[in-house]
Amino acid sequence: MLEIAGKKFDSHLIMGTGGATSQTLLEKALVASGTQLTTVAMRRFRAGNNTGTAGTSSGAAGGESVFGLLNRLGIDVLPNTAGCRTAKDAILTAQLAREALGTNWVKLELIADDRTLLPDVVELVDTCEMLVAEGFEVLAYTSDDPVVAKRLEDAGAAAVMPLGSPIGTGLGILNPHNIELICARASVPVLLDAGVGTASDAALAMELGCSGVLLASAVNRCQDPAAMATAMKHAVEAGRLAAAAGRIPQRTHAEGALASSSFEGLASWDEDWAEEVL
């Protein structure tokens, strides 16, 4: 069970709505994934309606919004500050989310530049601390630097969310050692965020010790979102079970292979016995 800021979720998979090509495909993917928490950029929200049915850029005019869809499916909304590049903008966005959606949860994103979409870790830690002081439960998107991850935890983050690789690249986990180190040192949930391309990436994240995986593009931009969402659901669970089971130690060529069965009792040719028989 995944627990963040005192709230428990059966699913360890968090979905994103970015990149969805249609509301119908998004709904099918969300249902197939089994997710109970999904992140939505606050820039999708239209002021004037705090019922969760505000219009969004991903829905047809007059149709159901992403917020309405999540509400109908019983999925918790995790508003994010996607697109923000300063502490001031991120804090304002978080405040608007709390007012509009009635939640003090926020996924904090502070982007350094539009080309790489890498997080601005210098601004990130201070912003996290300010949001925590205002009563927010901050889930902080960060780099795969273990030092920054620890500083975010010290600043009060409810969860740290290191990237596997840059957003939308599908490159998987480029630095598994750092992700494993972040997990080993953390006392809050570590959620892999960004860079997942296929199910094996999600499984690896869990094997490295992550508490959960957040992904969007890998599902929403693939050829069959519902099928990929199903694959991700099973991959996260498989990785979690494998981590709990404990993998066997890896052996180098110098150490040699290790037989799974003893050589004791192995049949061998006996000349004396052969002469008697033959």
Curated annotation (Swiss-Prot):
Source superkingdom: Bacteria
A GO MF term: thiazole synthase activity
Catalyses which reaction(s): [ThiS sulfur-carrier protein]-C-terminal-Gly-aminoethanethioate + 2-iminoacetate + 1-deoxy-D-xylulose 5-phosphate = [ThiS sulfur-carrier protein]-C-terminal Gly-Gly + 2-[(2R,5Z)-2-carboxy-4-methylthiazol-5(2H)-ylidene]ethyl phosphate + 2 H2O + H(+)
One Pfam entry name: ThiG
HAMAP family assigned: ThiG
Top enzyme category: transferase
Subunit comment: Homotetramer. Forms heterodimers with either ThiH or ThiS.
Active site: 107
Pathway, per record: Cofactor biosynthesis; thiamine diphosphate biosynthesis
Swiss-Prot/TrEMBL GO biological process terms: thiamine diphosphate biosynthetic process
EC number: 2.8.1.10
Principal location class: cytoplasm
Residues in coiled coil: none
SUPFAM superfamilies, per the entry: ThiG-like
Localization in the cell: Cytoplasm
Chain's role: Catalyzes the rearrangement of 1-deoxy-D-xylulose 5-phosphate (DXP) to produce the thiazole phosphate moiety of thiamine. Sulfur is provided by the thiocarboxylate moiety of the carrier protein ThiS. In vitro, sulfur can be provided by H(2)S.
Recorded family membership: Belongs to the ThiG family.
UniProt protein name: Thiazole synthase
One Gene Ontology term, aspect cellular component: cytoplasm
Alphabetic keyword roster: Cytoplasm, Schiff base, Thiamine biosynthesis, Transferase
Ligand binding (1-deoxy-D-xylulose 5-phosphate): 168, 194-195, 216-217
